[in-house]
A protein has these predicted regions:
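Leloir-type glycosyltransferase catalytic cores
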Residues: 285-332
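A donor-sugar binding/catalytic signature common to diverse glycosyltransferases
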Residues: 13, 237-278
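Active-site and donor-binding regions of nucleotide-sugar-utilizing enzymes
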Residues: 5-134
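A nucleotide-sugar donor-handling region in carbohydrate enzymes
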Residues: 110, 115-178, 301, 305-306
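Structural motif
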Residues: 2, 80-81, 120, 160, ...
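Donor nucleotide-activated moiety binding/catalytic core segment of transferases
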Residues: 213-255
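Short internal beta-strands
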Residues: 33-34, 121-123, 196-203, 268
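Conserved catalytic-core segment of nucleotide-activated headgroup transferases in glycan assembly
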Residues: 168-200, 205
Length: 332
């Protein structure tokens, strides 16, 4: 089935769309066509965005044609499903679906566009009291317990923990003293577990902090560690998730957290002293705690390796429930 994935060029949004496509592919064949949505006049991108959203109020085919005309042409012939994420794609997705009668799946907060404009509108909290608005337990991403298990290898027996490191952002602010304490805690943890840690930094990690981690932990991290500012961008984490005995992730990145959770492994989020995050984000993280998908601790606290059951069964049930709901909504 030919599926159009509309991209706004933001990697996190694109990965969410790909995550939904991967979920559906477990039951049906999908032929993905990825197209980046671009306005005809790039300098007018901001007003186009606002006008397109406004036109989605009581959307008609006439209004939909106006919205479509703002953007460079996209060939939708033979397309049977539209998937898109992010506010910048929502108006176009709604308009194209109305004009072509192709079912659409939209991810992300509505930004003023009603969920009724989408067959399935996936959000982390309820915005509209309509069945189209489906509330997610886990933000969609590229990983699943099965994909991580299939990607694992003999290194899964090395008792290694995985550390996903972010940085400043969404109201989380880390002091250097906190990073230094985390470094000492990782050293203590590796000695306690007689293992090395696998460390993955990200776009959000300050280059100086990445260098500090590399230099201070040079004898304590595995060769599989990935350093974003040293050529490690856009790494596929399936193997690392599959091999990890436990996952620690800084709490500033919802995508890193959702990816970690989706592996089915035990996940602990690490937070700094200084947090001034939007309520929507803190509620999102709290929901993961309430579902017992994560536990959380200060980045300065001692790291623990408690034995316990993984979340693989729970994650698989959540995935099956979401997949069933989507198929019902798009009538496939």
């Amino acid at each position: 089935m030919k599926t159009l994935i509309l991209s706004d060029g933001i990697p996190g949004h694109f990965n969410q769309s790909r995550g939904v496509a991967s979920l559906l592919q477990e039951d049906i064949d999908l032929n993905e066509k990825v197209v980046q949505l671009e306005p005809k006049i790039r300098s007018l991108r901001s007003p186009i965005k606002l006008i397109a959203r406004y036109l989605c109020n009581n959307l008609t085919k006439f209004k939909a044609k106006i919205i479509i005309s703002f953007f460079k042409p996209i060939d939708s012939s033979h397309v049977k499903l539209i998937i898109a994420a992010g506010g910048n794609t929502a108006a176009f997705s709604a308009a194209l679906s109305l004009l072509t009668d192709i079912p659409n799946i939209q991810l992300g907060s509505p930004r003023g566009i009603h969920s009724k404009n989408f067959n399935t509108h996936l959000t982390i909290e309820k915005y509209f009291d309509v069945p189209n608005n489906v509330v997610l337990d886990i933000t969609p991403n590229l990983y699943s317990p099965e994909s991580c298990k299939n990607a694992s290898n003999e290194k899964a027996f090395l008792n290694s923990a995985l550390f996903l490191i972010g940085g400043q952002g969404i109201g989380y602010s880390y002091e250097e003293a906190e990073w230094n304490q985390l470094i000492q805690n990782i050293i203590d943890f590796t000695k306690l577990t007689n293992s090395k840690a696998t460390i993955v930094t990200s776009r959000r990690t300050d280059p100086s902090i990445e260098e500090l981690l590399k230099n201070s932990l040079s004898n304590y991290f595995t060769d599989d560690s990935i350093w974003f500012h040293d050529g490690g961008a856009n790494a596929n984490l399936a193997e690392l998730f599959g091999n990890a005995t436990k996952i620690f992730v800084t709490e500033d990145s919802s995508m890193m957290i959702s990816e970690s959770i989706s592996s089915g492994k035990k996940v602990t989020t690490l937070f700094p002293k200084s947090i001034n995050t939007p309520a929507r984000y803190s509620n999102h993280i709290q929901k993961y705690r309430d579902l017992n998908l994560i536990d959380s601790q200060s980045i300065k606290d001692q790291l623990s390796f408690e034995e316990g059951k993984d979340n693989i069964e729970k994650i698989n049930l959540i995935r099956e429930g979401l997949k069933s709901t989507i198929f019902t909504r798009i009538q496939l």
